[in-house]
Amino acid sequence: MAKAKFERKKPHVNVGTIGHVDHGKTTLTAAISAVLSKTYGGEVRNFAQIDNAPEERERGITINTSHIEYDTPSRHYAHVDCPGHADYVKNMITGAAQMDGAILVVAATDGPMPQTREHILLSRQVGVPFIIVFMNKCDMVDDEELLELVEMEVRELLSEYDFPGDDLPVIQGSALKALEGQPEWEAKILELAEALDTYIPEPERDIDKPFLLPIEDVFSISGRGTVVTGRVERGIVRVGDEVEIVGVKATTKTTCTGVEMFRKLLDEGRAGENCGVLLRGTKRDDVERGQVLAKPASINPHTTFESEVYVLSKEEGGRHTPFFKGYRPQFYFRTTDVTGTIELPEGVEMVMPGDNIKMVVTLIYPIAMDDGLRFAIREGGRTVGAGVVAKIIA
């Protein structure tokens, strides 16, 4: 049994299936599980197990998601599949299932459909970096030219949303036939696995990214100075490092003169750890919750951005009524609420609970942000929406 322990050393990559209803996302997920476990070992999850997706709650939002795992010789994959369109929307916006790459499933019998387009747009908005296409149900199309036409359509659609439509891998296969164990179609699943391995680059680990710590609390320790505490989101902070305090007010520079965890002094604080960072020459009043401590020049404060937002339904504890332009809720980033105003797209008068919508948000003061940052929309402490920064404007 030494092998299983060794497997953990393989790079871990998060992927998922996206695409129109009934184009075969769940069947493909089951086929990948079956073919890869047969070829490389691992646990098989059948269609019924995947289709019966457990209900999860992410930031108060109900999402049905199935998680499966599989291995190729060089990598370990975690794969998400959702039963309904609404689950995809919620999953992608809340970042409940962050994807390093997505498998877009398009039935060759139908070609691209409305949700195909919507999932590609969502992938663009929430920052899914890579898409691989699996053209499904190819066993049902005899006409070679028709297959070529569908492939061309899908590639054009992806290019329309700034994905490299001409260059990304498109695999023509049949998930059902692969699941039934027909060798020619099983080979297509292995071809898809090969595309995952080669086309999606190994994701950068949190610890290798530039240091960032969202400040949760500030203390002054007599004779030592000011300590900020929080959980390191990414990177490493070492004693002696220069750091910036970003957001809310003008950015200031200081130096980390100590790191402590559970009252012990350390040389560094790493991604995932809760720690206190001692700052040189910083006054207690210079720093507040809602700011971040970061590697200099790695992140900037912004107030205006385009976002993709999911508005909670009444059943999820959201609003019972729509909202209109002029709506001024709080936007909760990392550790703090900031009031902001919204601008709705041309021709949209109101937003109903349960909708997803693109909106431009302007905050009353700046917050440290990058594209892809998640936030909640709150009214008096109650979450009424979830969003993601799609594009920073100012």
Curated annotation (Swiss-Prot):
<feature type="region of interest" description="G4">
    <location>
        <begin position="136"/>
        <end position="139"/>
    </location>
</feature>
<feature type="region of interest" description="G3">
    <location>
        <begin position="81"/>
        <end position="84"/>
    </location>
</feature>
<dbReference type="Pfam" id="PF00009">
    <property type="entry name" value="GTP_EFTU"/>
</dbReference>
<dbReference type="InterPro" id="IPR027417">
    <property type="entry name" value="P-loop_NTPase"/>
</dbReference>
<comment type="subunit">
    <text>Monomer.</text>
</comment>
<keyword id="KW-0251">Elongation factor</keyword>
<feature type="binding site">
    <location>
        <begin position="19"/>
        <end position="26"/>
    </location>
    <ligand>
        <name>GTP</name>
    </ligand>
</feature>
<dbReference type="InterPro" id="IPR041709">
    <property type="entry name" value="EF-Tu_GTP-bd"/>
</dbReference>
<comment type="function">
    <text>GTP hydrolase that promotes the GTP-dependent binding of aminoacyl-tRNA to the A-site of ribosomes during protein biosynthesis.</text>
</comment>
<protein>
    <recommendedName>
        <fullName>Elongation factor Tu</fullName>
        <ecNumber>3.6.5.3</ecNumber>
    </recommendedName>
</protein>
<keyword id="KW-0342">GTP-binding</keyword>
<keyword id="KW-0460">Magnesium</keyword>
<feature type="region of interest" description="G5">
    <location>
        <begin position="174"/>
        <end position="176"/>
    </location>
</feature>
<dbReference type="GO" id="GO:0005829">
    <property type="term" value="C:cytosol"/>
</dbReference>
<keyword id="KW-0547">Nucleotide-binding</keyword>
<dbReference type="GO" id="GO:0003746">
    <property type="term" value="F:translation elongation factor activity"/>
</dbReference>
<dbReference type="InterPro" id="IPR033720">
    <property type="entry name" value="EFTU_2"/>
</dbReference>
<feature type="domain" description="tr-type G">
    <location>
        <begin position="10"/>
        <end position="204"/>
    </location>
</feature>
<dbReference type="Pfam" id="PF03144">
    <property type="entry name" value="GTP_EFTU_D2"/>
</dbReference>
<dbReference type="GO" id="GO:0097216">
    <property type="term" value="F:guanosine tetraphosphate binding"/>
</dbReference>
<keyword id="KW-0648">Protein biosynthesis</keyword>
<dbReference type="InterPro" id="IPR005225">
    <property type="entry name" value="Small_GTP-bd"/>
</dbReference>
<feature type="binding site">
    <location>
        <begin position="81"/>
        <end position="85"/>
    </location>
    <ligand>
        <name>GTP</name>
    </ligand>
</feature>
<dbReference type="GO" id="GO:0005525">
    <property type="term" value="F:GTP binding"/>
</dbReference>
<keyword id="KW-0479">Metal-binding</keyword>
<dbReference type="InterPro" id="IPR000795">
    <property type="entry name" value="T_Tr_GTP-bd_dom"/>
</dbReference>
<dbReference type="InterPro" id="IPR031157">
    <property type="entry name" value="G_TR_CS"/>
</dbReference>
<dbReference type="InterPro" id="IPR009000">
    <property type="entry name" value="Transl_B-barrel_sf"/>
</dbReference>
<feature type="binding site">
    <location>
        <position position="26"/>
    </location>
    <ligand>
        <name>Mg(2+)</name>
    </ligand>
</feature>
<feature type="region of interest" description="G2">
    <location>
        <begin position="60"/>
        <end position="64"/>
    </location>
</feature>
<feature type="binding site">
    <location>
        <begin position="136"/>
        <end position="139"/>
    </location>
    <ligand>
        <name>GTP</name>
    </ligand>
</feature>
<dbReference type="InterPro" id="IPR009001">
    <property type="entry name" value="Transl_elong_EF1A/Init_IF2_C"/>
</dbReference>
<dbReference type="InterPro" id="IPR004541">
    <property type="entry name" value="Transl_elong_EFTu/EF1A_bac/org"/>
</dbReference>
<comment type="similarity">
    <text>Belongs to the TRAFAC class translation factor GTPase superfamily. Classic translation factor GTPase family. EF-Tu/EF-1A subfamily.</text>
</comment>
<dbReference type="InterPro" id="IPR050055">
    <property type="entry name" value="EF-Tu_GTPase"/>
</dbReference>
<dbReference type="InterPro" id="IPR004160">
    <property type="entry name" value="Transl_elong_EFTu/EF1A_C"/>
</dbReference>
<feature type="region of interest" description="G1">
    <location>
        <begin position="19"/>
        <end position="26"/>
    </location>
</feature>
<dbReference type="InterPro" id="IPR004161">
    <property type="entry name" value="EFTu-like_2"/>
</dbReference>
<keyword id="KW-0963">Cytoplasm</keyword>
<keyword id="KW-0378">Hydrolase</keyword>
<dbReference type="GO" id="GO:0003924">
    <property type="term" value="F:GTPase activity"/>
</dbReference>
<dbReference type="Pfam" id="PF03143">
    <property type="entry name" value="GTP_EFTU_D3"/>
</dbReference>
